């Protein structure tokens, strides 16, 4: 069959597809199925066109509906996108008829020429799979295939199928190793473009995890082949914006894989950057630079993670673009390629927007470009204008992400220093392998060890400071006690008529003087307590004595017989209307008690709603002295309407619930087991034998006696002396043993020992004195710190203005809450109430009165927030037992007195070895002096606590020092805990708020980015879409794939070149603005983690 007959036998070929002419089967019947060459099914109303030569007449005879239908079929066969069909469908009838005729003539001519050799898709596949054809014939076949793929309908492309795509893949793979296949590679990529110009072909390539087509296209990125690289960049960039199929990840993975096998994975973007600077001979119109820049914009704009975008951009810039950016700017400005200029503008906008977003994460951090350290200057000068500068800048940027934590920040820097040390000081005494980025660094426990060491160091330093403070406080109090003791001696000497030494020789110390007597005049004897008010009538009581604190004048004369006593002066503000005299005594009601010390009645608060009560025990004014804290307390000045209103709302009362009292376990008294200890000779001998078999077993009885005579405390430890005191037989037994020994009668070893040491006169007092000498330092150490702590704590409590303000504020809140109750208008409260503040909860049962107090102090009175810093000795004072101190002081005084008595009785040594007077005399002198000083310090502490009890109006005999300071400590610790709870809750709320804002911001940014990345094509449409690759390329070409960027919302900053010039100058900003520094973990994890 000739070529002409073969063409004729096709029955019109493409015309049959377009006009739906039914073909006759071998039996002569008309087939109603799908036509040949992928034609569409024939409908029942299709007309049969007799031949191609008659189609013009036939078109003229078509109705408008039929013409529209045929025109729509032609548009679909031409793969024209739907958004561009409207202008064509709006054409007039004559224009549409002409377009149909032109199209059919061209298709018919193309079909005749194409069918000269390749009739079906399988023909192309079989021909290209045959490797015996010459390069020229293969090129002609591929070029014809490209025309066929572009011209034929989708059904023809589907028939070409996966097998055809595989054939093109083999051609591309063969072209990599054959220089003569360069044109074939170019046409093969164009064939792939035609195949993927519909959703079916695009899904075939992008549905697999990694199709070989993507790898081959990535391998075609060679700047030495400009046309081929342009086509490959178009397809790869189009894949990146097919988000439904993860095209971006697949393209990036393909580029990385090819770079790892071809040159270096770390330089995967080098061909793309090199293409930007292709010569004029290779890229005269700068199309390659334009498509390379489009691809770079696609890579750096598509990811939603800012860190990843910055990382990619830094990697691309390190491939030489950073150094030659100014040169590329000149290339863009000199070119006439408007697309290149447009995409270079997009490149700068994307880069600046990402930098702006990066800077906005650290709005509270500013960089002082004029304040730099010498080390930074040296490093900056070393790397400036070198290839190391981008890496140095990247290191600085990474350092900004270190956690903002007091303990972990130094740990991070120490870890980084360790890494740099291992890299720079390489163990092989040479440069490390730069190709291998894995450095074996032991970091398993490094950070934890660093933090623990830092905490231990801080704790040790704090303990040292506290120890030094205690030593200074102890020395201060001891010096004051010594000065007081010396002053007493001076006064005693003056009273005895002995001239006192010069006062200049006395140390100048601040000795608290006794308080002045009450009253402004002289020093009269203390008056009896005032009588309570009495009702008028009856025998008149004697006139009341003058109130304490007022000038005492002569008492008024007694009233005449039968008359009542004169009424007391009216209270301020209590005068009768009109200023008339008060009624006669017989007509008066009960007398109002006169407030002492100039106290004024407390303000009664008008509270509208019932409130929870401050269950304190108010202090009666009559129990207060004129020096009491409550007399000077002016809590009304602290009142503010806003927080009192908040207090009324938060602590409004609800239906009273019966409080279930916690069962308090009664302390169980440990009954000592009464051991009936009987002193027997056998028991005494056994105890002495056990003692001698211990640390004294290497000494003879005579040597032990000599040690006792010499007072040798190096051998006689406190434990041995206590055992001797405990097990020593009574004096009559010792005397009896000495008599037996003197007669020369044999004695057992234990009795010989007892008889030997019994020869020492006053043995028992000697043992007690030696034991006192050894235990004296421990006894002093046991009570002296307590005395120092108690004294210092009393002074701190009395002098702390911050603590006084806290008490005033509590009095204000309590009086406000107790308005209308029996405890209202209290002048003071017992200090023990401080521990009960946490028992009062607000109306929501979520917060206590103590938490509210801590929050109120922080907001309204921040100067008093750290009042606990003024009470540094309260913790130790809470463990001070006054009875134990007094008992220890009595013991020491008694022991010193006994020692002094024994020294008087042992002035003459018993023998040459007797060193009692020599050894113990010096100790007794030092001990007496120190015990006297301790006694003065104890008296000073007791006096200060007594003054403190008068200051806060409590009974020191009922409210001991230990209980008082324990309550202060409990309140102080509870206040700190409440404040920490408030801070924690506030931080949690702030964190939630920031997290919500970050999520909303991230959602908005994600939505905006998704809007910019809105799918150009629907990859999951039920019907195959056409022209998808054209739409993707158009979106990239016009820049619509990168979205509409809001340039006005961004802060005005220097342009790219100017900013780079600024960064080139040594102006590293290191100072931080005032305000709370937003931590890296709080910003980065919330913004990126929620995305």
UniProtKB/Swiss-Prot annotation:
One of its GO terms (biological process) is cellularization. Pfam families: Drf_DAD, Drf_FH3, Drf_GBD, FH2. The keyword Signal does not apply. Residues 1-56 are annotated as: Basic region. Residues 994-1010 have a biased composition (Basic and acidic residues). Residues 25-34 have a biased composition (Low complexity). Residues 455-496 form a coiled coil. Residues 512-596 form the FH1 domain. Residues 601-1001 form the FH2 domain. SMART domains: Drf_FH3, Drf_GBD, FH2. Keywords: Actin-binding, Cell cycle, Cell division, Cell membrane, Coiled coil, Cytoplasm, Cytoskeleton, Membrane. Residues 59-431 form the GBD/FH3 domain. The keyword NAD does not apply. PROSITE patterns: DAD (PS51231), FH2 (PS51444), GBD_FH3 (PS51232). Residues 512-572 have a biased composition (Pro residues). Residues 1-37, 499-589, 994-1021, 1039-1072 are annotated as: Disordered. InterPro entries: ARM-like, ARM-type_fold, DAD_dom, DIA_GBD_sf, Drf_DAD, FH2_Formin, FH2_Formin_sf, FH3_dom. Belongs to the formin homology family. Diaphanous subfamily. May interact (via CBD/FH3 domain) with Rho1. The DAD domain regulates activation via by an autoinhibitory interaction with the GBD/FH3 domain. This autoinhibition is released upon competitive binding of an activated GTPase. The release of DAD allows the FH2 domain to then nucleate and elongate nonbranched actin filaments. DAD-mediated autoinhibition negatively regulates dia localization to the apical cell cortex. This is Protein diaphanous.
